[in-house]
UniProtKB/Swiss-Prot annotation:
The lineage of its organism: Eukaryota, Metazoa, Ecdysozoa, Nematoda, Chromadorea. The modification Phosphothreonine is found at residue 644. GO terms for molecular function: potassium:proton antiporter activity; sodium:proton antiporter activity. It is found in: Cell membrane. Phosphorylated. Belongs to the monovalent cation:proton antiporter 1 (CPA1) transporter (TC 2.A.36) family. The chain crosses the membrane at residues 41-61, 73-93, 97-117, 128-148, 165-185, 192-212, 236-256, 268-288, 325-345, 351-371, 390-410, 418-438. This is Probable Na(+)/H(+) antiporter nhx-9.
Length: 667
């Protein structure tokens, strides 16, 4: 033991002596260069800064940003930087799969799940499931089989096996949610079309990764070493991986809701759990070989409605901003690195393979969409029209998911350079050509766009009434449809789930707070209309009496009122005689009633913005509507003179005022 201590002190003495000699020989230095200590983080920060500045510049260049999506412009910036680095003989950077799947992809998928309009997704769950599962399987085998058939005639410069080309066809079938959101948010398509394309793109990625991992395992094992049991296990893994990822997401969503429920005394920790637990869901699913994309997407979708009741409004807004910031930063870096990697990566250019891949991607997606929509239209009340099917076929944009998967192909697959080149070519074609031309096509085909107004209070109420009425009709008919499922879930949610996962929630058999609030507003509106009708009848009676030359009898209470009426009373009387002012008062009292009922139903402190306008909405469809309303507001501001609601010379109806108000409750 003593000998070991002696050796340890001897090593420490030698090390200290060496450091002392270096300090003495070099002397004291005012500045020391420590680039090796910070260069990794510094390079990442510089790339993020360049990408963010480029995005600001694009928004300032209105003629260009109007027609070109930000994703295509960021790819151009990456191409330019890659060319500069190549010409100056500097080492370029590439987007490796480890960085992409562990650091850049999780914020994007969490953002997509957290801001997913859950009601619209559930109403179209059947079509989203068909497109994302069966559509992906169809594209994978159709593209792979066609390319394999062409390879039998030696049309390509590199050879590949059956499972190797299925690996490529699986990754090239991945519709990228980043590219879809970037394009479809800007063209303001209707909710029905948006949720089907966006929902397919989100869950299609999870299915794609499952197929990719399965075929990659088959390729590494070798077709000659596979048995029937291996094929059966691989097919079973498709369902196990997908459903297991969903189960992981549900577990961590419950954990996030429960932890935020008990952070009332330490509110600063609530956002920590909101971001850490979904990321842990992603890592946990990845660790046990389940679908990490489905896990974090499901976690974000389920936890949203519960954590909002456990945190303050200020914290909820902070979560929205930070989620958007992370997702936007990741998207920006990914698209720029796609352009940069084009110059840095090793390529094998095969024109026939690229053209064949692009052709099969377009034609088989169109065939799959048409066939699936034909089958779905036979069982759906809301049909897919031909123009909807065309936009869905044309909107299958490829992006970072496909590139992240292709660069993670094992080096043992000899055709990997050809696959990388073909993937980049398909991404460029879809992002540039299809992304730029989809807006003119939407305008040319007159696709129904998102309405530039929020639903009125009456529309929201009667939509809710319709849900309960249809649930009753299904119950009477003895059929269990999705309206019955909605009612049962809402009752179970209000009675069991919310009291467990949310603070200040009592066990109720029915959650009717939104209907009560809306009914109070309808009652107020009816009272205002009744007062206006009585006022008009009295005015017409007085005019008829005056026209006949008779003097209307003055009652004693009116005489006393006229004698004691002050100038302020006369001003108020003239103000109330105007129907326009009655409308404005209704709007004022309606908003006050909403605020008071909201405070009664939500005892927690709510902090609102100064201007009352959220620039980040609760889901993507609200985001699209907000942008439309904002542009409409600016157009109306430029056309109308500045007038107050009480003194403008233009008549405003109650319906117009209601149309500009925000909806009171979520249908």
């Amino acid at each position: 033991m003593s000998s070991r201590l002696f050796v340890f002190f001897l090593i420490c003495y030698a090390t200290a002596d060496k450091i002392e000699k270096e300090l003495i020989s070099d002397g004291f230095q005012l500045f020391t260069w420590k680039w090796d200590d910070v260069h990794h983080v510094y390079v990442i920060t510089v790339w993020l800064l360049i990408a963010s500045l480029a995005k600001i510049l694009f928004n300032l260049m209105k003629p260009i940003s109007k027609w070109c999506p930000d994703s295509s412009l960021l790819i151009i910036v990456g191409l330019a930087l890659g060319w500069i680095l190549h010409q100056t003989s500097l080492s370029g950077a590439t987007l490796d799969s480890h960085t992409f799947f562990l650091y850049l992809l999780p914020p994007i998928i969490f953002d997509a799940g957290y801001f997913m309009p859950n009601r619209a997704l559930f109403e179209n769950f059947d079509s989203v499931l068909v497109f994302s599962v069966f559509g992906t399987i169809w594209n994978t085998f159709a593209i792979g089989g066609s390319l394999l058939l062409m390879a039998q005639y030696d049309l390509f410069t590199m050879s590949f096996t059956t499972f190797e080309i299925l690996v490529f066809s699986a990754l090239i079938s991945a519709v990228d949610p980043v590219a879809v959101i970037a394009v479809f948010e800007e063209i303001h398509v209707n909710e029905f079309l948006f949720i089907n394309v966006f929902g397919e793109a989100l869950f299609n990625d999870g299915v794609t990764v499952v197929l990719y991992q399965m075929f990659k395992s088959f390729a590494l094992i070798g077709s000659e070493n596979l048995s029937v049991l291996d094929y059966a296990t691989g097919g079973l893994s498709f369902f196990v991986v997908a459903l297991g990822g969903a189960a992981v997401g549900i577990i961590f969503a419950i954990a996030a809701s429960l932890t935020t429920k008990y952070t009332y005394d330490v509110r600063i920790l609530a956002p920590v759990f909101i971001f850490v637990l979904p990321y842990m869901a992603y890592l946990t699913a990845e660790m046990v070989s389940l679908s990490s994309i489905i896990a974090i997407a499901i976690c974000g979708m389920l936890m949203k409605q519960y954590i909002k009741g456990n945190v303050t409004q200020a914290a909820a807004n902070s979560v929205k901003y930070f989620t958007k910031m992370l997702a936007q930063s990741s998207e920006t870096v990914i698209f720029m690195f796609l352009g940069l990697s084009t110059i840095s990566s090793q390529h094998h250019f095969d024109l026939y393979f690229i053209c064949a891949t692009l052709f099969f991607c377009l034609i088989y997606r169109a065939i799959g969409i048409v066939v699936q929509c034909y089958i779905l239209n036979r069982f759906r009340a809301k049909k897919f029209e031909m123009v909807d099917q065309f936009i869905m076929s044309y909107g299958g944009l490829r992006g970072a998911i496909a590139y992240g998967l292709v660069v993670s192909i094992p080096a043992s697959i000899t055709a990997k350079p050809m696959f990388i080149t073909a993937t980049i070519a398909v991404i460029y074609f879809t992002v540039f050509l299809q992304g730029i031309t989809i807006r003119p096509l939407v305008n040319f085909l007159k696709i129904k766009k998102k309405e530039e107004r929020d639903p009125t209070m009456v529309e929201s109420v009667y939509n809710k009434y319709l849900d309960y009425m249809m649930s009753g009709v299904e119950d009477i008919a003895g059929q269990k449809g999705h309206y019955t499922f909605i009612e049962n879930f809402e009752r179970f949610n209000a009675k069991v789930i919310k009291p467990v996962l949310m603070r200040h929630q009592k066990r109720e058999s029915f959650d009717a707070s939104s209907i009560v609030r809306a009914y109070e507003k309808i009652t107020l509106e009816d009272a205002i209309k009744l007062a206006k009708v009585k006022n008009n009848i009295q005015n017409k009676r007085l005019e008829r009496i005056k026209s006949k030359g008779r003097v209307a009898p003055i009652l004693p209470d009116k005489i006393s009122n006229q004698k004691t009426m002050t100038p302020k009373d006369l001003q108020l009387k003239r103000f109330m005689e105007s129907g326009e002012n009655i409308d404005s008062l209704y709007t004022l009292f309606s908003d006050l009633l909403d605020r008071k009922l909201h405070e009664m139903n939500r005892p927690s402190v709510q902090i609102t913005d100064v201007d009352g306008q959220d620039d980040i909405q609760d889901d993507y469809m609200a985001e699209v509507g907000s942008r439309s309303n904002l542009s409409a507001m600016f157009r109306s501001t430029e056309q109308l003179p500045s007038e107050t609601p009480f003194h403008s010379g233009r008549r405003q109806s109650t319906g117009d005022l209601n149309a500009t108000r925000r909806a009171d409750f979520n249908v």
